[in-house]
């Protein structure tokens, strides 16, 4: 991996870490469903235009639209509806750690299919222990934690991302990552409309500058620029080397949250985060021969 790719990946992790902060900022004025809807309403046409300019858009067949719809529902609509709702009830740091449970769910799916090995099993159990520490705050009174509802939603979010990953891997036999993501964004935006209607559409003309800045950051930087850079890196380096960078996101998020939101991670969040990320690394790292 060359130095340019290293720098771009580090920048991408900084941007994704900042997303948890800007979601918190956007939630000051907008409800979670409106924030998610407007984020992808802005991001979808931009990513579609990029893919069309770069290589043109492949036209899905009739049955493929159903598969794409399931992907969009799991990986965009429900994923971000739950994530934004979760961030009303949990900290940015907790959210950035718990979303990584997606790798554990993917590993569990592999175990169900008989792809078990001691390293992956150890990673699953280690991650589970870390998650329990974060959510319980080290007490047996598990459900007394102030962040329990948001934490559980983020674990559900991890499961949804795992569903998207597993189902999406089959579609990648025909479509490249960027095209698949562009279609998922577009369909996911449409499926977010009922959620926004349910909570009442917010009038974008009345948004304050903070909310506009949050939406621009989440849509242009997080959903378009960062994804384009991520897929660029995947074509210029092996996937394991690229994936390791994701483990920087919770660290960057904790630093940003401390200064921007005055969030102070407690001892159990810090230790639980380290254990969770270590477990995720064990489940995803390639075995050396």
UniProtKB/Swiss-Prot annotation:
**What is the protein's membrane topology class?**
Multi-pass membrane protein
| InterPro entries documented for this protein | AA-Vitamin_Transporters, EamA_dom
Task: Enumerate the UniProt keywords alphabetically.
Answer: Cell membrane, Membrane, Repeat, Transmembrane, Transmembrane helix, Transport
Major localization class: membrane
Q: Where in the cell is it found?
A: Cell membrane
State whether keyword Signal applies: no
One Pfam family for this entry, by name?
Answer: EamA
Q: Membrane-crossing residues?
A: 7-27, 33-53, 65-85, 92-112, 123-143, 148-168, 182-202, 212-232, 241-261, 265-285
Query: Domain EamA, which positions?
Result: 14-136, 159-285
Q: Which domain of life is it from?
A: Archaea
Statement: the UniProt record of this protein carries the keyword Membrane = yes
Give the protein family: Belongs to the EamA transporter family.
Its name, as the record gives it, is Uncharacterized transporter AF_0510
* Originating organism: Archaeoglobus fulgidus (strain ATCC 49558 / DSM 4304 / JCM 9628 / NBRC 100126 / VC-16)
